[in-house]
Amino acid sequence: MALLSSTLRAPLVFSKNPKPVSLSSLHSRIYLSPRSPRFPSLRFISAAGDTGDAEKPSSNISDEWGEGSEPETKPFTYFKLPDSDPPKDEDEWGKGAAAGAGSYNDAGNGTPTFAAEASPEAEAEDGVDENLEGLKRSLVDTVYGTELGFRARSEVRAEVSEFVAQLEAANPTPAPVEEPDLLNGNWVLLYTASSELLPLLAAGSLPLLKLDKISQTIDTDSFTVVNSTTLSSPFASFSFSVSASFEVRSPTRIQVTFKEGSLQPPEIKSKIDLPENINIFGQQLSLGPLLQSLGPLENVVANISRVISGQSPLKIPIPGERTSSWLITTYLDKDLRISRGDGGLFVLAREGSSLLDQ
């Protein structure tokens, strides 16, 4: 019956000329249900009459059969807290782990940190640099003890050629002539397969004579190249050089024209330093008796040194058709240079480089 009476009164609200409803009357018809455990609900009660008084809400609710029933109570929902502190799979915006996948660093309780990841390009570059350093060191170790290649056996030459080919394939400076900061400077010869240097290398293997150093100085500002050689003996050291000019023919090739040779005055040693034994054609020769008679000879050597010191170097022009040559740089970095000329292969290290430390 309550349902029927409510249905009969409902059209009065939507009649053509309804009676105005005051705010106080409307407010009295709205109440908050105290039985909802989670959210308040709004209930509207039909007007009882023209006076606008609201009916007292009943605590019982009638169903469609007219029987009273208690209002249903919604079960309370429990929320499971995350197992980790702070949570790994969600942030304050409700986003999951996909937003920061791969960048979360579990540091326990506290503020999470984000680890910096190296780019693939940087890792690849580091790998290439390490590979080149390993190849350079292997090449230097292979040529060590070969007297600049003069005493290198066939298997050693083959191994050197393999290392050189790998370095040339990974050359970090494809246009060395256009890189003066790398090309300029003094370069010390480590190994050569040049037939033109064989007589000089052979002289360094003579008894009481040692080939100390062969070097090449390049100056791209003046377009000059100077090849220098130093020999030493128990009595003195000798230095001579050959100067040349060059023209750039390509980013890797220069054309060299030799001008003149220069012989420096010998540097006489204050004390004669003879070994006790020398090897001559496979025979050991003792120099003991000679060492005992060197006392008076040292005074003569000291006088000669004072006479020739301060003398100007001897200049020797280089005539003939063989005054021109070409040189291609096939590998260049801050401390190693590989060049090929019409006379063969040259492996050089920059003066002061750690590659010269053996």
Swiss-Prot record:
Its main location: plastid. Keywords: Chloroplast, Plastid, Transit peptide. This is Plastoglobulin-1, chloroplastic. Residues 48-114 are annotated as: Disordered. GO terms for cellular component: chloroplast. It comes from Pisum sativum (Garden pea). InterPro entries: PAP, PAP/fibrillin_dom. Belongs to the PAP/fibrillin family. Residues 1-47 form a transit peptide. Signal peptide: none annotated. May form together with other plastoglobulins a coat on the surface of the lipoprotein particle. The coat may contain receptors for attachment to the thylakoid membrane as well as regulatory proteins that may function in the transfer of lipids to and from the thylakoid membranes. It is found in: Plastid, Chloroplast. The keyword Calcium does not apply.
